[in-house]
């Protein structure tokens, strides 16, 4: 699917992980993309920052905490959350441990082999079905399904989803071994944000077979390991809150895990 682009810059942040900045006059839009080859020792890890469901932290702080014992090369904010206490609204699984239960909405989940899936889970007799993921971060709705824009982009109950706003999304490429993490800046004169349908069109243009919308608006944040600063974690996008980066409920990190002998 064609997508209008005026300028693209790219840099490698780790073996198999590239950071792209895409500019389009159509919005206008500034879009950040992390393209992750899951066959190059790169794994996705959900990050909470505490051992309980509650708590709000900046995405940079969550990834920096993980970076004390893992080689974090990038990541984005995760699920929608309860403003009062920071608890994610959907399933959160960190290193195999369920911190919040499923709510019937879809999640981005990774099985024991690190294979990504976008689907809804149920809880039956204390067991997650259809399988117990190693990592899972919630979102809503599914925006691309089987290489087509999903009808949910026009039916999701929140009116803001049908308006242009900052966005965070995750996509799985055809074949299932490449992951796309995407942020779209918005609420600025030079950056309009996207509707979910526009976001779905971009995820398709990237090559996503399936994609899910994550928490957006002021929560939208992408972090990457800057190769020009010895891998220091930096914010790639422009968070839209006046105070800068928002505290969020959870995040999704990309870790370069070659040589790792144990789980985080």
Q: Model-found features: residue ranges?
A:
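Conserved, well-ordered active-site substructure
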Residues: 85-103, 110, 158-174, 178-209, ...
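Short, structured patches in soluble enzyme cores that scaffold and shape functional sites
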Residues: 112-114, 120-122, 139, 145-148, ...
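Loop/turn elements at helix/coil->beta-strand transitions in domains of secreted/extracellular proteins
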Residues: 69-73, 115, 148, 175-179, ...
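Short, conserved active-site entrance elements at the starts or edges of catalytic domains
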Residues: 133-158
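Short, glycine-/Ser/Thr-/acidic-enriched flexible segments
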Residues: 26-29, 39-41, 81, 115, ...
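Zymogen propeptides
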Residues: 1-108, 115-119
């Amino acid at each position: 699917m064609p997508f209008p682009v005026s300028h693209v810059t790219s840099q490698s942040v780790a073996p198999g992980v590239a950071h792209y900045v895409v500019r389009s006059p159509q919005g206008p839009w500034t879009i950040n993309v992390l393209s992750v080859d899951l066959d190059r020792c790169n794994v996705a890890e959900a990050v909470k920052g505490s051992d309980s469901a509650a708590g709000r932290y900046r995405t940079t702080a969550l990834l920096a905490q993980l970076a004390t014992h893992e080689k974090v090369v990038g990541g984005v904010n995760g699920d929608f959350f309860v403003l009062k206490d920071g608890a994610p609204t959907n399933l959160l699984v960190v290193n195999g441990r369920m911190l919040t239960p499923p709510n019937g909405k879809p999640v981005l989940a990774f099985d024991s082999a690190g294979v990504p899936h976008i689907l809804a889970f149920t809880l039956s007799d204390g067991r997650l079905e259809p399988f117990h993921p190693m990592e899972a971060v919630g979102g809503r709705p599914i925006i691309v399904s089987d290489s087509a824009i999903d009808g949910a982009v026009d039916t999701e109950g929140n009116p803001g989803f049908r308006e242009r706003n900052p966005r965070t999304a995750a996509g799985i490429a055809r074949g299932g071994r490449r992951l796309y993490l995407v942020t779209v800046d918005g609420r600025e004169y030079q950056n309009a944000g996207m509707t979910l349908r526009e976001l779905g069109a971009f995820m398709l243009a990237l090559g996503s077979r399936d994609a899910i919308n994550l928490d957006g608006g002021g929560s939208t944040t992408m972090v990457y390991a800057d190769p020009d600063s010895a891998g220091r974690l930096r914010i790639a996008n422009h968070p839209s809150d006046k105070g800068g980066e928002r505290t969020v409920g959870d995040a999704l990190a990309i870790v370069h895990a070659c040589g790792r002998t144990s789980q985080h």
